[in-house]
Amino acid sequence: MMRSHYCGQLNESLDGQEVTLCGWVHRRRDHGGVIFLDIRDREGMAQVVFDPDRAETFAAADRVRSEYVVQITGKVRKRPDGAVNANMASGAIEILGYQLNVLNEAETPPFPLNEYSDVGEETRLRYRFIDLRRPEMADKLRLRSRITSSIRRFLDENGFLDVETPILTRATPEGARDYLVPSRTHAGSFFALPQSPQLFKQLLMVAGFDRYYQIAKCFRDEDLRADRQPEFTQIDIETSFLDESEIMGLTESMIRKLFKEVLDLEFGEFPHMTFEEAMRRYGSDKPDLRNPLELVDVADQLKDVDFKVFAGPANDPKCRVTALRLPGGASMPRSKIDEYTKFVGIYGARGLAYIKVNERAKGVEGLQSPIVKNIPEANLNVILDRVGAVDGDIVFFGADKFKVVSEALGALRIRLGHDFELLTCEWAPMWVVDFPMFEENEDGSFTALHHPFTAPKCTPEELEANPATALSRAYDMVLNGTELGGGSIRIHRKEMQQAVFRLLGIEAAEQEEKFGFLLDALKFGAPPHGGLAFGLDRLVMLMTGAQSIREVIAFPKTQSAACVMTQAPGLVDAKALRELHIRLREQTKVE
């Protein structure tokens, strides 16, 4: 072996021993005739000292520059008093180098590895192989490896089998666009890359593999955000003969064990909250419970006011009128209120009403707002009491369709929590349960809230009679306002699956064409089953404190779904296209 130790493994217990290191020169310094090299590898850094007594080695060290690849042999020794570096794992020792081999030279990198904050992300992604040398990036990928190892260990110990499912499959409606792969041998036909292993893992349950897991690559051709990539990794889990409480208990234990092993954090039992309560109190089905702010419904106090902005929604069962109190916010300048008004407009809100509570004892005179003249004082007092308003607070209001108000004030709640540093703790895991089966569209049609294979909490007859109010056996694990994982008990009876398809507008012929294999499987003794899938990239992002999942993926795509390093996607030559029976249409020029 070319090395005896990694740099990050060196400590005082090795004092006096000979070691051989391999890595990159992170920094070179010349102090008073002595050369110091900081050597970096994936596990950390170590300081190597070369003195002029060994002329040949000293001369070699003098020629070395940053990012040269080197092999160094030397003796471990404790650093002198006052020279200990507490910021380095090996900071209590140094290596007295007496042999240095340059394994490869390096050109000057396109950006310094010590000063990266002002380097654009595109440059970092173009030279990702250099960007990943930075200790901050290496730390994230090492922690990602520890996370997957911990999860595999837990699932292996609990009787789960790691089974791979196909990457080349067929398109099924799962909510996003598919990535399509043309078939050379079947002219005009296409494979689809899987958005998830959903149907295959259900078929594994039918086949009798009652505890399955896979760390699976998934693909979705959708618009990208901070927590989205066209290809992403999923911790996919499915079980038979367990109900939702047992699946939730098992996967909660896995996450609690993971945080203890990797971050030395202990979580208590995760609280449970229904979807209805989460939307009512927080305006989100993935609430951040670190934030103490809550939405409070006040429609009952505004039904009869002479102010249509409030009275209209207050009397419409499809709308809501909601208040959000910000403690100590009465001193907020108008410019900041205007900024928040613009912010909620992103979510469809047509304005942001507010009341500043300056001195409640003075009644209406102690309130500052353009809307107080439209609301009777008795109603104002009920509203202020209900939200817990005291002097110095500001209360914001939303009045519109239920979805608009929930999303707008829910997002404002998160924004205020961060802007005013209101978060009460570092971690807040929870479960959200009792999701609706369907979302009703403007035209009265239905969309599956999770996916079409989620089991409802009712019979097929009850489901078809009252689809708008049906609840599902779905559950989401949420951490700090981020959905870590989502799952459900699946439909295991053919009649129920067909009923759900019908409600989604998928008639018998289309059912057979797209899902015939699943319906066949449900006829042959499908067991009760359910599961859950975690987004590995999001989980690592949270555990490392990264701002984007691009920071925790070795070679991510940009927000335009491109790889600037390999220049993918790229053009394909005409011969390859002919073999795939594809002819490109000329782009119409826009004048």
UniProtKB/Swiss-Prot annotation:
Location(s) in or outside the cell: Cytoplasm
UniProt-listed Gene3D superfamilies: Bira Bifunctional Protein, Domain 2, GAD-like domain, Nucleic acid-binding proteins
EC number: 6.1.1.23
UniProt keyword annotation of Oxidoreductase present: no
Biological process annotations from GO: aspartyl-tRNA aminoacylation
Catalytic reaction list: tRNA(Asx) + L-aspartate + ATP = L-aspartyl-tRNA(Asx) + AMP + diphosphate
Alphabetized PROSITE patterns for the sequence: AA_TRNA_LIGASE_II
Superkingdom assignment: Bacteria
Binding residues annotated for L-aspartate, in chain numbering: E174, R220, H450, R490
Site entry: Important for tRNA non-discrimination: H31, G82
Main subcellular localisation: cytoplasm
HAMAP family: Asp_tRNA_synth_type1
NCBIfam families for this protein: aspS_bact, PRK00476.1
Family label: Belongs to the class-II aminoacyl-tRNA synthetase family. Type 1 subfamily.
Biological role: Aspartyl-tRNA synthetase with relaxed tRNA specificity since it is able to aspartylate not only its cognate tRNA(Asp) but also tRNA(Asn). Reaction proceeds in two steps: L-aspartate is first activated by ATP to form Asp-AMP and then transferred to the acceptor end of tRNA(Asp/Asn).
Subunit structure, as described in the record: Homodimer.
Protein name per its UniProtKB record: Aspartate--tRNA(Asp/Asn) ligase
Organism: Pseudomonas putida (strain W619)
